[in-house]
A protein has these predicted regions:
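Conserved phosphate-binding/catalytic region of the ribokinase-like
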Residues: 4-20, 169, 186-201, 206-216, ...
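Short, well-ordered alpha-helix to beta-strand connector turns
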Residues: 26-27, 80, 170, 217-218, ...
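Structural beta-sheet core signal
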Residues: 31, 85-87, 204, 257
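Conserved beta-alpha-beta core of the PfkB/ribokinase-like small-molecule kinase fold
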Residues: 47-52, 56, 126-134, 138-145, ...
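Conserved N-terminal subdomain of the carbohydrate kinase-like
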Residues: 5-7, 29, 37-174, 331-353
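Glycine- and other small-residue-rich loops at beta-strand/loop junctions that grip anionic moieties
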Residues: 86-87, 177-180, 286
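Active-site metal-binding loops of divalent metal-dependent hydrolases
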Residues: 34-35, 178
Length: 353
């Protein structure tokens, strides 16, 4: 039984994506946003506290990793892209550890400002399982140490000036907003305008409270919950209608919606909607999902790929994260992405034998 025309196009597109991923061509990506530390504490939760109905975690291991925009920078580096990261950290242990970790992986850190007396955001997740059962870990608790005050004016102005100067020759600009004070109204307006003038496409992962900063942005990333919230807020009857209204209101080119087990959908101002279904059966976690999609889109833009190819690549990147069993797999890697795209190609070939 042969492939239909649609299946043949899918097969050829995926095969070309695999070829592109295997190439060693590099490209420059400018990245600005909040930088933080992620800490993971693993253990067993066999008992409840005798004085309160809360589980007791017996720690077995812990690990630290960079998060937010720094997490995106690691993904870009893994994909063979040159990431120029701009953000701030505090003059504390966590901040210095972030810089050291990034430098150890070859990520450029000259754009990270160390702000005196500022607290570096640290998000700690406690992951537990029952020792007597063979079961995946579950998130038990998360607690945050953070400072979301605006970055001091002097540091913020310098940060955006450096980022604007660095746009020359960039294939894309990524803005990663976690609400920690780096992405500002004035800074975003100047940076996005400079990118537009330089024909550098902008990818933005905005807070829903910061959509006003994203007018005229090329690529916007939402999770499905965010689109549903906006649907209710603007009174649209469907997610597709909400996406269309948001694209018109903010003059976006593309709205990328990540829907977990439902896959990835790209709504566009001037093109047909494209949907890539998720091929996973067992979804394990979602940490780093938007970061992975941003990396995949940046890679796609650096190769001049179309929206259809971009949707397939972003979906495969999300599948890598959704199926991750280890915390070190929460960062998108080129090897994992090549393997995932290859699985889609193989499945198409096998199903049509």
């Amino acid at each position: 039984m042969g492939m239909t025309d649609e299946e043949a196009m899918l097969h050829d597109t995926l095969s070309e994506l695999k070829r592109q991923l295997r190439s060693n061509d590099s490209a420059k990506i400018v990245l600005i946003g909040d930088v933080m530390m992620d800490c993971y504490i693993h253990g067993y939760a066999n008992n409840l506290n005798s004085r309160a109905p809360v589980p007791v975690l017996r720690e077995t291991s812990r690990e630290e990793d960079v998060g937010a925009a720094a997490h995106v920078a690691r993904g870009l580096r893994s994909m063979g892209l040159s990431s120029h990261l701009f953000g701030v950290v505090g003059d504390d242990t966590a901040g210095l550890s972030i810089i050291e970790s990034l430098e150890a992986e070859g990520v450029t850190t000259h754009g990270i400002a160390i702000v005196e007396d500022r607290t570096t955001t640290v998000k700690t997740r406690m992951l537990a399982s029952r020792e007597s059962l063979i079961r995946d870990e579950q998130l038990l608790l998360r607690w945050d140490i953070e400072e979301d005050d605006p970055v001091p004016d002097e540091a913020s102005v310098a940060l955006y000036e450096q980022a604007i100067d660095d746009l020359q020759g960039a294939s894309a600009l990524i803005a990663s907003d976690y609400g920690q004070g780096v992405i500002t109204d004035q800074g975003a307006e100047k940076l996005f305008s400079a990118a537009k003038k330089g024909n550098v496409p902008v990818i933005a992962d905005p807070k829903l409270t910061g959509l006003h900063r994203t007018e005229n942005v090329d690529w916007i990333l939402f999770q499905s919950q965010g689109l549903e919230l906006m649907r209710r807020r603007i009174g649209a009857s469907t997610g597709a209608e909400a996406a269309e209204k948001l694209i018109q209101q903010y003059n976006w080119n593309h709205l990328v919606v990540l829907s977990g087990e439902a896959g990835v959908t790209i709504y566009s101002a001037d093109e047909e909607t494209v949907h890539a279904p998720c091929g996973l059966i067992d979804l394990r976690q979602m940490i780093g999902l938007i970061d992975a999609a941003a990396v995949a889109i940046a890679f796609s833009l650096s190769r001049g790929l179309d929206v259809y190819s971009t949707a397939l690549l972003a979906n495969a990147a999300c599948e890598c994260i959704l199926g991750a069993e280890r915390t070190d797999a929460f960062v998108l890697s080129k090897d994992d992405l090549i393997h995932r795209v290859g699985e889609h190609v193989w499945n198409l070939q096998v199903s049509k034998r």
